[in-house]
Amino acid sequence: MFLWLAHFSNWLTGLNIFQYTTFRAVMAALTALAFSLMFGPWTIRRLTALKCGQAVRTDGPQTHLVKNGTPTMGGSLILTAITVSTLLWGNWANPYIWILLGVLLATGALGFYDDWRKVVYKDPNGVSAKFKMVWQSSVAIIAGLALFYLAANSANNILIVPFFKQIALPLGVVGFLVLSYLTIVGTSNAVNLTDGLDGLATFPVVLVAAGLAIFAYASGHSQFAQYLQLPYVAGANEVVIFCTAMCGACLGFLWFNAYPAQVFMGDVGALALGAALGTVAVIVRQEFVLVIMGGLFVVEAVSVMLQVGWYKKTKKRIFLMAPIHHHYEQKGWKETQVVVRFWIITIVLVLIGLSTLKIR
C-alpha cells in the first residue's frame, strides 16, 4: 500500500524511497516483528481465556506432559502479522502477493479448524488425514495452476538442479503441477511435523524464508538473474516483501515460543508457514534448493515415514520415537539441546543452499 506514496515523489522527494524493494522489505520485517511483539501478550491472554490449551499426547515423551494446557493456535498471530505487513508494504498489483497470501490463509484455515477440534474435543489427532490431504491438495493445485499460467515464458516452467547449470528440464503443465503439489503439500506437512519442541520450527522457518528472499530478489531482477544464471521471474522481487514479513512475524512469535514456551503456533501456523515456503520456492523455481535449505523439515518428515513404514512391515521401530527430534530426547538430549543443535544445522544448510547461487 505504501508503494503508492512513491507516485507523489514529484511533490516530496523523500517519498521516492517507497519504490525500493530493499527498503520495503526491511520495513515489512520490522512491521511484522513489531506487530507480533505488540499483540503477542494479548493473544496469549485471549487464548488462555478461551481455554485453547494444547492437549499433549500421552504416548509422547513424558517430559512433555508439563506442557499440557499451554495455549496453542498462536500461529494465528503470525499469519495476521504477515498479512498486515505484506498488505502495507507490498505491491497490490503483483499477483504473486495474492497467491502467497491465499495459500497462507487457506492452509491456515485448515490448521485453525484442526486446532479447534483438538481444543474443543480434546482430541490430539484433530481432523482426519483424508480431510487434511484433500484440503491441502486443492490449495496446492489451484496455486500451481495460477503460477503456471502466470509464467511469462518457458524458462519459468523448468526444473532447475542445483550446482548443475546445464541441467534444466522442461516440465509442461502436468510436470509443473506435480512438482508444485509435492513442494507445497510436502513442505506444509514437514514443517508441521517439525513443530514439536519449543521454538524448533519457528527459527528454521525464519532462516529458510530469508534464504528464499535472496533468491526471489535475484530472480526478480533481469541483470542479477542473467549474471547468476537464474530464471528471470518478472515480479518476483515483490515476493521478497512476503518473505521478510514472514521472518519478522516468526521472530516476534519466537519471543513467546522460546523455551519454556508461553504459546504454541499449532497447526494454524505450521501448516500455513510450510505451504507458504513451498509456494515461494515454486515461484522462484528453486524447489531443490528448498530441499537443501529446509533439510531439517525433510529429515523430520522422512523419519516419520520410515518409522511408520518399517513398523507396519516388521513390527519394529527404527527410531526410539518419531519425528526424529523425539528420538534424540529419548536418547537423553535436553529439549533446548535438540532445538539449538537443529537450528545450527539449519544455518549450515541455508548457507549451502545460498552457495548454489555461484557454485554451478
UniProtKB/Swiss-Prot annotation:
GO CC terms in record: plasma membrane
Keywords recorded for this protein, A-Z: Cell cycle, Cell division, Cell inner membrane, Cell membrane, Cell shape, Cell wall biogenesis/degradation, Magnesium, Membrane, Metal-binding, Peptidoglycan synthesis, Transferase, Transmembrane, Transmembrane helix
Pfam families in alphabetical order: Glycos_transf_4
Broad class of where this protein is predominantly found: membrane
Cofactor(s) listed in the protein's UniProt record: Mg(2+)
Principal EC category: transferase
UniProt subcellular location: Cell inner membrane
Reactions accelerated catalytically: UDP-N-acetyl-alpha-D-muramoyl-L-alanyl-gamma-D-glutamyl-meso-2,6-diaminopimeloyl-D-alanyl-D-alanine + di-trans,octa-cis-undecaprenyl phosphate = di-trans,octa-cis-undecaprenyl diphospho-N-acetyl-alpha-D-muramoyl-L-alanyl-D-glutamyl-meso-2,6-diaminopimeloyl-D-alanyl-D-alanine + UMP
PANTHER family, sorted: PHOSPHO-N-ACETYLMURAMOYL-PENTAPEPTIDE-TRANSFERASE, PHOSPHO-N-ACETYLMURAMOYL-PENTAPEPTIDE-TRANSFERASE HOMOLOG
Function: Catalyzes the initial step of the lipid cycle reactions in the biosynthesis of the cell wall peptidoglycan: transfers peptidoglycan precursor phospho-MurNAc-pentapeptide from UDP-MurNAc-pentapeptide onto the lipid carrier undecaprenyl phosphate, yielding undecaprenyl-pyrophosphoryl-MurNAc-pentapeptide, known as lipid I.
Name assigned to this protein: Phospho-N-acetylmuramoyl-pentapeptide-transferase
Top-level taxonomy: Bacteria, Pseudomonadati, Pseudomonadota, Betaproteobacteria, Neisseriales
Gene label: mraY
